[in-house]
Design a protein with these regions (language model features):
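Transmembrane helical cores of multi-pass ion-transport proteins
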Residues: 1-396, 400-405
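The feature marks cytosolic C-terminal regulatory regions of anion transporters and related permeases
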Residues: 347-496
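Short acidic-hydrophobic, aromatic-tinged amphipathic segments that line or gate anion-handling sites
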Residues: 499-501
Length: 501
């Protein structure tokens, strides 16, 4: 990024403060979603933007606690420690530290494009499934009940079937908060609906009283940077850390890439990986948990006037300065945070995109739907759904390229084959089968013309199969000719195929 891009712009301070006012209540909510005490969300919200601002490539990307990363954190840790316990908090810090190290290493070895392993169908299905799981996990808080463990959907159904466990006060508070947050977006895109909901809820509890669940003791003070983490659990957390490092980067990568195109800015995914890695590293050492890039807060920062990475640093600094006064939020109804989470993640379910995949790409639709269902069924261990979804996407890709499209025809005594697709080890036999079928229909032909212009890629096995077919055809008395060899395949065909190209 040029030196000009890091000079202070008047809009950076305003944007940073604006995002911080939204981030503070969101961080509390996402901390509870991740299974850590609410105050730990503020530690992550303060430290992550400060670290990311030092290395980030995007001038807008708002780093901090996010819904998806928080849910992945809960899925990774809830099976090995009791949520909100001291052991759980330390494990969350170690998990963030490992995510940070992995992202920094990937950035240094220039593995930024690895974010594209999360294909669009997988991301579509995963984010939609995660949104359903997140909404289900917040239903007990909305009705003022206590949820059991296990699958959030089953827990939510259990709560809904037991109205006797509800707290009547929580429901209208949650509904009012949801309407204010969602309605605020319609009034103006910069309206801080979640902040307004928090302020009004605090005023309500102070003036009228509230008997439902509140945040309670949050604790105050600044985070302490330390490497006193449970290193004995390192091996156990490597796999989930890798999943979060990859999946959690796919979202900020798509956000940063989109805005770089809209604003004609250069964006470096490798540098962004390092920035996101540094954010997780500092969050982990400072008592936080894994963090990522937020689409809603990034859009808010850009619309509020952010022009450089200083806006992110401002956000972190504002949250840091607020930490000594965080006790003012202790009477905040938990139902308000639940409503905020539900409204925030509701946009992740993109039904029109599912419909488009169904209409135009049934195989990709199947991958998206399978990933969605797996995410819902396997919750809270949604990282497994991600892994299976990626494998399904790879299998779908291989299946699609397994079959070459091979138009074939006869012109006089010459047979013509025009393979289209990728000629590689799995699809090569299809070319030989097509020639055999055409030869069986026209046994009197004596010429073969292979039109290769439709091939996208040719690997060694494909080139060897091509040479074998040509040798067999010549041995059978055919005159063989290659035409329209694509530029990307000329080198390997010239080396492998005994023909001048």
């Amino acid at each position: 990024m040029s030196k000009k891009s890091v000079r202070l712009h008047p809009g950076d301070i305003l944007a940073g403060v604006t995002v911080a006012l939204v981030l503070i209540p969101q961080a509390l909510a996402y901390a509870t979603l991740a299974g850590v005490p609410a105050g730990r969300g503020l530690f992550a919200a303060a430290l992550a933007p400060l670290a990311a601002a030092l290395f980030a490539s995007s001038p807008y990307l708002a780093t901090g606690p996010t819904a998806l990363t928080s849910l992945l954190t809960f899925g990774a840790l809830s099976a090995i420690a009791v949520p909100a316990s001291s052991d759980y908090v330390l494990l969350a810090g170690l998990l963030a530290f490992l995510v940070g190290v992995m992202r920094i290493v990937m950035g240094l070895v220039r593995a930024g494009p690895i974010a594209y392993l999360m294909s669009r169908p997988v991301m579509l299905g995963f984010t939609a499934g995660a949104a359903v799981v997140i909404v289900a996990s917040q239903i007990p808080a909305v009705v003022g009940a206590t949820a059991s463990g296990g699958n959030p959907l089953l827990a939510a159904l259990g709560v809904l079937r037991d109205p006797g466990s509800w707290k009547a006060e929580a429901i209208p508070v949650a509904i009012a908060a949801a309407l204010l947050i969602a309605g605020g977006k319609r009034v103006h895109h910069l309206f801080p609906g979640i902040l307004a909901a928090v302020v009004l809820a605090l005023g309500f509890t102070a003036l009228v009283g509230y008997e439902g669940a509140v945040l309670g003791d949050i604790g105050s003070g600044l985070p302490t940077i330390s490497l006193a983490l449970p290193w004995g659990s390192l091996r156990e957390l490597l796999a989930p850390a890798l999943v979060i490092a990859l999946v959690g980067f796919a979202e900020p990568a798509s956000i940063a890439r989109r805005y770089s195109i809209l604003d004609r800015l250069r964006w470096d995914p490798n540098r962004e990986l390092i920035g996101q890695g540094a954010a997780n590293l500092l969050s982990g050492m400072g008592g936080g948990f894994p963090v990522g890039g937020s689409l809603s807060r990034t859009a808010l920062a850009r619309d509020a006037g952010a022009r450089t990475r200083i806006s992110g640093a401002t956000t972190g600094l504002v949250v840091l300065l607020f930490l000594p006064f965080v006790t003012v939020l202790e009477t905040l109804p938990v139902a308000v945070l639940a409503a905020a989470i539900i409204v925030t993640v509701s946009d992740l379910v993109q039904v029109p995109r599912f419909r488009d995949y169904y209409r135009y790409a049934r195989l990709q639709f199947a991958v998206a739907l399978a990933t969605f269902l797996l995410t819902v069924i396997l919750a809270p261990h949604i990282e497994r759904a991600v892994i299976i979804g990626i494998l399904l996407a790879i299998l779908a890709h291989l299946w699609r390229e397994l079959h070459l499209s091979i138009p074939a025809w006869r012109d006089g005594d010459v047979l013509h084959l025009a393979p289209k697709g990728v000629l590689y080890f799995a699809s090569a036999p299809g070319l030989e089968d097509a020639f055999g079928k055409l030869l069986g229909e026209h046994p009197s032909a004596n010429g073969l013309n292979l039109h290769l212009g439709g091939l996208g890629r040719v690997d060694l096995t494909g080139a060897l199969a091509l040479r074998g077919l040509m040798d067999d055809a010549r041995e059978a008395g055919f005159e063989v000719e290659l035409s329209d060899v694509p530029p990307q395949a000329k080198k390997i065909i010239a080396r492998v195929v005994d023909n001048s190209v």
